[in-house]
Amino acid sequence: MRRTMMAVLMAVLVSVGLVAAGTGTAEAKTRKQVGYTQVVVAPAVYDLVTGAGISPAPLDGAKAYPYKGTLAANFPITGYSLGSLRIKHSGGISLTAGAATIELRNFYIDLGRGRVSGVVNGTVGNVGRVDLFKIRFSDNARLGLVKLTLTDTAAGALNATFGVNAFAENATFGYATPRPFSRF
């Protein structure tokens, strides 16, 4: 498992340009970046969400669109830190069903910890920054470079917000592919 996670980490590092030949100056440790990370919702999750009447909508400059029978969203990369192996994003997504809503914003991909965090607020209250997903090796490369599985916190917030018992820790939520050199 450790070997697999190291392979995933290296694939993500290379894809976002954090591993490069040569050396940089001290001020190059944190950089402003262009590009985006594409997140594709797992088809089974998309079916569950839409079947429950939950509507997703992009926030603050994110883009959402149909993709291979499911939904994809692009979140702008705003910078990265070599020291903390963190990729920062702006934008977010809201999930709404009737009066119930949850907003997830300003994602950080933390490669060192293998987690994706975001700022959460909505019907459950203003929670602040929490770990939302665990980064795992993708089992569906056509949807994304890495698989995102729910943390217990994220699953609990989704279940509490929508009054369901459909989300569980370690369940696949979707797939992600950072595209740091692509136009948003």
Which residues does each predicted region cover?
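Generic alpha-helical propensity signal that fires on short helical segments
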Residues: V19, T23-G24, V120-G122, A166
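N-terminal segment immediately downstream of the Sec signal-peptide cleavage site
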Residues: E27-L82, L145-F184
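Predominantly extracellular/secreted and cell-surface proteins with exposed
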Residues: L59-G128
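Secretory targeting and sorting signals
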Residues: M1-E27
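Extended amphipathic ligand-handling, pore-lining, and cofactor/metal-binding catalytic surfaces
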Residues: V119-V120, G125-G156
